[in-house]
Amino acid sequence: MKIAVLSRNPRLYSTRRLVEAGRERGHEMVVIDTLRAYMNIASHKPQIHYRGQPLEGFDAVIPRIGASVTFYGCAVLRQFEMMGVFPLNESVAIARSRDKLRSLQLLSRKGIGLPVTGFAHSPDDVPDLIEMVGGAPLVIKLLEGTQGIGVVLCETEKAAESVLEAFMGLKHNIMVQEYIKEAGGADIRCFVVGDKVIASMKRQAAPGEFRSNLHRGGSASLIKITPEERMTAIRAARVMGLNVAGVDILRSNHGPLVMEVNSSPGLEGIESTTGKDIAGIIIQYLEKNGGPHLARTKGKG
């Protein structure tokens, strides 16, 4: 197969591993800088150009689109879909998963366990919003934040009011969530490919920190997940329409709660923790399910 990898940086661990795994299995792997791809939108035959040449003959595309380039990245991916190239994850599903609030609304509608979450626009509604999620301590999140940036734990209601008013004053969209104390600063990253959790790891926040992101100094270890956690991760990925996803789950007193569904999960932490060839499993998924003109949405939506 001829497989495109949409990535800003060919030296990133995840990009490198996907290229290695594809080549090991005899595929032609081409890394394309997402922001250097350009297209004629109105042409009769959908096309993408890259460094002066048309991109042709691809069977599948692996999007590794960073949060900051979601809009342009999804436009490029949509064009690939319109050309009949099979996407590992579809543009619609990626755009959906990048909108944190919409993701939670979709997951909630399907009855998937979530922390109590509030959303408001006006500072006048802050006291009621805090009460809605059960009071302090609580977590405030910027909707545009990634890798734990823009996530604040407020120990008191006074602190929560100050932080909320500051964010709202800066015209940021924020959501407020109950703090799951019993999770003890740990979460579980379940790596879903197709309809299977192929690997999972526990991420523990550094001492004095509550955010378990590895980018924030958290540590990772092996963990055995329960059947309920496995099913929750698979269902969450399915609701979002993602073939490959990193589903972050908290263990609470009332079962697994989904924190986030990531459409472009990193491979370094999960591969080094579990010793599994995740990149190889992703390529095998493409071999089994990919191929020209198998894109479900064909770039619509």
From Swiss-Prot:
Statement: the UniProt record of this protein carries the keyword Metal-binding: yes
Tell me which domain of life the UniProt entry assigns to the organism this sequence originates from. Bacteria
Q: State where ATP binds.
A: K141, E178, Y179, D187, R211, S212, N213
Cofactor(s) the record lists: Mg(2+); Mn(2+)
- Enzyme class (EC, first level): ligase
Could you tell me what the cofactor note in this record states? Binds 2 magnesium or manganese ions per subunit.
Q: Which InterPro entries match?
A: ATP-grasp, ATP-grasp_RimK-type, ATP_grasp_subdomain_1, RimK, Rimk_N, Rp_bS6_RimK/Lys_biosynth_LsyX
Record key words, sorted: ATP-binding, Ligase, Magnesium, Manganese, Metal-binding, Nucleotide-binding, Protein biosynthesis
Provide the binding site for Mn(2+) 1. D248, E260
Write out the residues that bind Mn(2+) 2.
E260, N262
One cellular component (GO) term of this entry: cytoplasm
Biological processes annotated in GO: protein modification process; SOS response; translation
Which EC number(s) does UniProt give?
A: 6.3.2.-
Q: Where does Mg(2+) 2 bind?
A: E260, N262
- Which molecular-function annotations from GO does this UniProt entry contain? ATP binding; metal ion binding; ribosomal S6-glutamic acid ligase activity
The ATP-grasp domain is annotated at 104-287
Q: Does the keyword field hold Membrane?
A: no
Q: Which Gene3D superfamilies match?
A: 3.40.50.20, ATP-grasp fold, A domain, ATP-grasp fold, B domain
Sites where the protein binds Mg(2+) 1: D248, E260
The record's NCBIfam families line, in alphabetical order, gives: PRK10446.1 (NF007764), rimK_fam (TIGR00768)
- HAMAP family (UniProt xref): RimK (MF_01552)
Question: Which family would the database say this protein is a member of?
Answer: Belongs to the RimK family.
The protein depicted here goes by the name: Probable alpha-L-glutamate ligase
What species was this sequence derived from? Pseudomonas aeruginosa (strain ATCC 15692 / DSM 22644 / CIP 104116 / JCM 14847 / LMG 12228 / 1C / PRS 101 / PAO1)
- Give the organism's phylogenetic lineage: Bacteria, Pseudomonadati, Pseudomonadota, Gammaproteobacteria, Pseudomonadales
